[in-house]
Amino acid sequence: MNATTVRPEIELGPIRPPQRLAPYSYALGAEVKHAETAIIPERSEGDAFGRLILLHDPEGAEAWDGTMRLVAYIQADLDSTEAVDPLLPEVAWSWLVDALEQRAEHVTALGGTVTATTSVRYGDISGPPRAHQLELRASWTATDVELGPHVEAFCEVLEHAAGLPPTGVTDLGSRSRA
């Protein structure tokens, strides 16, 4: 999983995995670097970030339909027009399905949720008065021990959620985040 090459805008590295979900686990954290500085500020959750967790049970789990389960979580800030788009959940889910179909040989038991939220701050709370986020939670079973394509698919979904242009395309304007 660590040998995967991702876009330079994404910082990818190991994080502490959950300890009680399976006999073995490993996790990667990913965050999109801020375009203005090309770094991730120390006190930031980022415009888009996520984690990909590998759970392994050599005896398998019936609900997994296999021995290796991947669990993904992605959160990204949205602007107000994106947040109210009624097709946002379907489009965000299609990013994952398409990325897995293009990169991973075969997956089973794919499931998850897509949530768009709007938060309104009141009183003495710092931050913008309104904030909009997209959350994608998904899990699937890998049928092959080669996990690099799964990491690449996860990072591709993170790229879409962050609004990064496709690889090889230059963004002539910046997308506003509110």
Per-region residue spans from a language model:
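Short, conserved charged micro-motifs
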Residues: 37-39, 81-85, 145-150
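A glycine-rich, hydrophobic loop/mini-helix early in the fold
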Residues: 27-75
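Glycine-rich, often proline-containing surface loops adjacent to acidic residues and nearby aromatics
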Residues: 25-27, 65-80, 130-140
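Short, internal acidic amphipathic alpha-helical interface segments
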Residues: 86-124
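Short, extreme N-terminal leader segments that mark the start of a protein/domain
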Residues: 1-18
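Mixed-charge, glycine-accented linear interaction segment located at domain edges/termini
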Residues: 137-178
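Long, low-complexity, Ser/Thr/Gly/Pro-rich intrinsically disordered segments that act as flexible linkers
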Residues: 18-21, 27
